[in-house]
Amino acid sequence: MLLPDFLHQRFHSRPVRDVEDTIDKFVCTVFSLQRLQTSFRSCYAVDDAFIVLFDNSFHQLQANPTGGTCNQNNLAHIPSLTDYKLFLLLLFATALISCIPSSFSALSFLATLRKRSKSEKKREKTMRNSMLP
């Protein structure tokens, strides 16, 4: 497995195999469901051979580089850098969600569409009835 360039730069003084093994065990992405509709700023930090996503309060979510599992609140646990593209995809999806204003929700949007389609159907029915002799 090849490490991304930024990891090679960060750990150039350490044996690459050690770094890869440690990172393989602890690559975590953590999303807080309650905060998806608020402005969600995220950045990820590489430190002591693990990557962890920071939440919008910039509190470091817990991951243990020496053993154990990721924080219980994880919605996604990615065990290997071979899934690095998925990690970036989730990050991109989170960034897209952050563009949605906090007052806006997907459910209210769907409800609006449903109401609109009902009113359109009613209008069509009225028009059809008015065209009948």
UniProtKB/Swiss-Prot annotation:
Q: Per its UniProt entry, which superkingdom is the organism in?
A: Eukaryota
Q: Where mainly located?
A: membrane
Where does it reside?
Membrane
Q: Does the keyword Transmembrane helix apply?
A: yes
Q: What keywords are assigned to this protein?
A: Membrane, Transmembrane, Transmembrane helix
Query: Per UniProt, what is the membrane topology?
Result: Single-pass membrane protein
One GO location term (cellular component): membrane
Segments spanning the bilayer are 91-113
Q: What else is known?
A: Partially overlaps IRC24.
What is the protein name given in its UniProt record?
Putative uncharacterized membrane protein YIR036W-A
Q: Which organism is it from?
A: Saccharomyces cerevisiae (strain ATCC 204508 / S288c)
Lineage per the UniProt record: Eukaryota, Fungi, Dikarya, Ascomycota, Saccharomycotina
